[in-house]
């Protein structure tokens, strides 16, 4: 028998009352947690994501934060147009669209041989390259060392950052930061809202966050990817050179590689610090120019912008183990090194599939931006002691599997 109208109304009122009180309880509890824990950055994070129907950071977050502007070059490098016509196959197009690709560009030498955009993303659109910015920071470190502002790769961090002069931190060097082997206790999770990564993205005190980290293992022993290392490098550059990071980036690289558009770097607050571990916004074509600089081992128009010795050192992988307990073949001085194919690929990488791939043997640069990526190739638990399996896949482990597809597409277009 169905409920009478009066009983139904009472039931609806009761349901709404319980729902309202539940929501009120959750809001009060969340606010109490934020206030008592001091994690006020969560307000910014919630307002920038969940209240806008998003679950996390996106490539178009530029106006969510205050930012610095890095002016484009006065002498723009014009890409030549390829005389040949290339296109994606239906299968490749489907692959790109399934991963919400926003741009895919292929350059060979001085020529732009393929360029495609999706949705509202166009050639003038700037997007966040996320952690691909880490490699940009590394190039700036190389310049600062070569010019004598930073003494050497093996200079203690404490020379520039006072909080690292005492205790276990005084053993950490610039090289350790670049190799992601500092031994610091940094929470890198991109999904955990309570991680150091989340606080660094939405918070307003980057210096306080990175200098308060504790040492939990001996530096230089294990590869452990941490965005805090990159941020410390940025502070070292500023302390050593006396210049703001964005100004230094403009003077030493961005103005010298023929960039066509301004770039933007998110700050932690008004007149604050650049989020050097991520959050550099630029156009896909300008990211291609950065890839070309890497491809040419730091040289542009016959001039050595980044020292050659540093570019060669940058792509070496040190004799240390990864978290899987295998030799590190994947990461040099803040640059990814893929040696699982026929020829080496050196690349900048950011979450959600931001890539600037340089393939020296093909004189090739590939830029991909978008909002999704595939998972990293990881070591299955049951294969950890299988030496044959490890030998076969050790140079692919830790790389996102989609780069293999992008490399394949780029190489197909240059045959």
Predicted regions and their residues:
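A small/polar active-site loop signature that marks catalytic segments
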Residues: 186-268
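N-terminal leader/targeting segments and the immediately adjacent pre-domain N-terminus
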Residues: 2-121, 150, 398, 403-415
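Active-site Gly/Thr loop motif
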Residues: 261, 315-365
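Active-site helix/loop module of the DD-peptidase/beta-lactamase fold
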Residues: 147-185, 212, 239-278, 282
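Active-site-proximal alpha-helical segments within enzyme catalytic domains
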Residues: 229-236, 276-299, 354-371
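Active-site SXXK
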Residues: 110, 127-153, 177, 233-237, ...
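Short, small/polar residue-rich loop motifs at catalytic or cofactor-binding pockets
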Residues: 98-101, 125, 351-352
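Structured C-terminal helix/loop/strand segments within mature extracytoplasmic catalytic/sensor domains
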Residues: 15, 31-40, 48, 348-415
